[in-house]
Amino acid sequence: MKTLVFVVTVAAVVGLSAQGEPPRPARTVSDFFRDFTADWMRANPNQAASTRYFSGAEQDRFEEQLAPNTPASRHEVVLLAQKGLTELATFDPARMSVTERVSAELMQWQLNTLVEGEKYRDYQFPLEQFGGVNVNLPALLTVNHPLVTEKDAEHYVARLGQVSARMDDAIAEARGLAAKNMFPPRFILRATIVQMRQFIATPPAKNPFVTAFADRMAAAKTVPDARREELRAQAEKIVAAQVYPAWKRGIALLEPLAGRANDDAGLWRFKGGDDAYRFALRRFTTTNLSAEEIHQIGLKRVAEIEQEMDGILKKLGRTQGTLQERVKALEKSQAYPLTEDGRKAIMADVEQILRDGERRAALQFDTRPKAPIVAQPYPRFREANAAASYSAPAPDGSRPGTFQIPLRPERMTKYTLRTLVYHETVPGHHFQIALEMENPALPRFRRLRALGGISALSEGWGLYAERLAAESGWYENDLEGQLGQLDMELFRARRLVVDTGLHAKHWTRQQAIDYGIEASEVERYVVNPGQACSYMMGELKILELREKAKKTLGDKFSIKDFHNAVLSAGTVPLDLLERRVDAYLREATVVASLPKGESVVPVYHEPHHRMLFAAGTTKILEAQVPPGDTSWYHTHTEPVLYITLSQSQQRTQVLGQEMNAGRGAPPAGARGNAPPAGGRANVPGPAVPAIRATSTTSYYEEPITHRITNAAIACFDSWS
């Protein structure tokens, strides 16, 4: 077999001691990520406040603001996104690290989606019972506003004083949309009116803006009692004088609209609605599948899951009636009392399931979040319409991950409770989102989800977590619990059918309810088209990739390694997830091919090289490079390569170990200029070398020759 020989020079990466003024380094894509994200946060002050992105006086300004969400403010954000896309395109992907390249692709996808989505903004009414301003403003302050110090409490009161102005912004936008006949169906408007009336039905002192504020100040224990009462009284006064009148103005706008509206539910009812729905499906599933294709996938999965459920119901002796009738009877038999004692009992069970899940997860995960997770019920005014949800922990540790559950009657059952907790907490959303926040390898915009999340992967992972718990024996001999897990999966499969039915096939609200989806869920799909499809489409992709990994690796497959691969990808579109898993499979195949007893140590090189060294040997088991970077390697035809290190490289490896130990002196006899600054090694496990290729200098006097022969390991780019 032909032998290929090429020459590169290698320098150990240590501090610069150059003579004279060093050249100014070129701006990197990582610099762009940092600067653009800061600009993005300044354009989105509510996000800056919730994540505590800045510090000092600048952060204080954001924490005192309640930013507007108007057509004008959104236009400024779109202009910033377009500017970001233009600048991002100036960076050469071939000069990026793997993480940088994926981050650039993710940012490009997110900014393009935001820009495209703004033209469909008129299809989103600003007042509705699930994600309207009337819901988001209370959630922003009562849950997400940082509240640790007395200054935080003062900022809360300052922002509360701006709530009425933000509600008036929403009313003005809603009035403009109504003039174009762009408003929700009658049943959505009526439900929103009921919810808004309920929000202002209590005395101001009992309103969530006041009670949650008082409770959080008390929990923080940093605000003196007298000052705490003073601030609470200020909040109560603002709610009475400003917030309640603003809510009444919103209700006054909606009431006549409810008289004008009909019950047509889907986007098809609007001009351009079909295009808007196609965009929604692309946004939420990150695929190009049509509504019809997704509808058919849903029908197939519904039939499969119903057959499996029927078998378990028969084992439980429930043979009479339709599947839905038998499930309802079982669900009712496991209901909690609709009393305060019942509410306490369900929350106690949630806590037990959550902590038990944390213990069991150690068998499937070797990487778990540091941030804690807590569970709490929704405030009463949200119970009728809210879906169970997870809120990420604060990056500074001031707020844990939070699971909120609505304690309305249909949720007060043990039947699906275990599955719900697994989805929202451990090993579901809390594992994925908190681990992403804690991953130092990711740029900050990804750790904080500054540009938003990716529903297909987030919700797909949550649904996968439900299934994983069932597959792993977490339900033990609990047949009712296993049935509940299948019922929740059936629910997500029906969502594919119902969401596409409503928005592409002219289904009515009642048709969707008759198909097996409760009314409040149907209404959520009406106001948030496409999102319900993200769950199962994401889960199916994860399961497909897991099956691929099992077939590729055989008895070398490790569920922990697979989960590491998926979770380390961060929140990305499904095609990028697949590329990450493919890279893991190539690497795992390399490891599996090693002789017994030999292991590998990963080494991450700057700017864009990654290698796997066999521990205790001089083999480079894997070298990864960006496409087209001929300065690092020559094109070759052999699919498998073996690289033999020269003696000089072995000395460099020793030097790398010394540098990582904090010494950094070159080995005896080494000559030449000091290497360039700026490189760094992200080195898990044992100390290993940090080296980089350069075309201008060598740490050693002699050049280093790599002799490549046909033998062992391929050279490839891990994400392409």
Describe each model-derived feature in a short phrase.
Residues H636-M659, G664, G678-G685:
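Glycine- and acidic-residue-biased ligand/ion/polar-headgroup-sensing regions
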Residues V14-R24, T589-K596, R663-A681:
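Compositionally biased, proline/threonine/alanine/serine-rich low-complexity intrinsically disordered stretches
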Residues D629-S631, N682-T709:
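Histidine-centered metal-chelating micro-motifs
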